Structure formats: C-alpha cells, structure tokens
Amino acid sequence: KDYRTFLRENVEGIDERYSGGFFVDKLGKRLGQHKGFPFYTIGQRKGLEIALGRPAYVTKINPHKNTVKLGFEDELLCNGMRLSSCKFVDESLMSSPELVVRIRYRGTPYGVRCLVSDEKGMKVILNSSASAVAPGQSAVFYIGNRVVGGGFIESPLSEHEIVC
C-alpha cells in the first residue's frame, strides 16, 4: 500500500476535510490545486501531478493554509537543523569529532560541525548539506554504530542561523 491509500483507509473523512488546497511557489504564487496537504511529504517528487518544466519537489507544507510549496532539488538542501527534546547518553560525546547524525533510518550519516544549545533547543550545524530535513523527523546521533543521542527536528536552519 502507498501512503495515500493508508491514510484513506485509516483516517475517516480525510479527503473531504483536506481537499481543495493549492500548490504554491516560493513567492506564494498559486501553481495549481492539490489533493490535500496530508497526502504529501517534504522531499516528495512522485505523484504531484503538476509540471513545472523540470522535476519539482515538495519543499514545505503549511497545514494552516492547506498549501504545499513546490520547488527544485537545491531548495531542499540545508546545512543545519533545530532540534527539540535533544538528549545524549553522555554530554561529553557532543563534541566528539566522530559524531554523525542521521535523519532517516539507514539514511546518509552527516558529520556534525557543532552543536549549539539555546532557549529554543539545540542547533545542529552539519559539515555538508542534507536534503529534505522536515519537522517531526527524528535526528539520531551516532559514534560508529553506537547510538549516543537524538532529538526531534523542529525546522531546517536558514543560512543566517548557521553559526557555531
């Protein structure tokens, strides 16, 4: 089963509740109608049923406005993320040069340049760009094959927030 079928079978009235939203570009211009924001995920390319002249991806979802922002592959990239509920088995491991983070099960491990705690949670600055970092995903920290920490992604960081 695909994700849409699963939702339709398990969430009563989902089509009626969330139909009629719009795909928008990065400036907010309407590009066409979508089938309801719950049916899309950040980074999704297949099943959009809209043509923009080159491959388009879901870059952001606004459930309050029932909009799905579309963009291109480079717009999915970020060099950091903000986490909530971040915990480590030993805080001294947070500064290990061997520390990596994964944002998907069996996903690419990204080297961690630095971690910055503030009143909003934890900023994770990466050594390289990650794609399709989305709120709600888990970020799991490893040293080798050992899980040493984790947290929940609140948002990707913008370029001006990438400061160690």
Describe the residue ranges of each PLM region.
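Nucleotide-activated chemistry modules centered on ATP-dependent adenylation/adenylyltransferase
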Residues: 1-147, 151-164
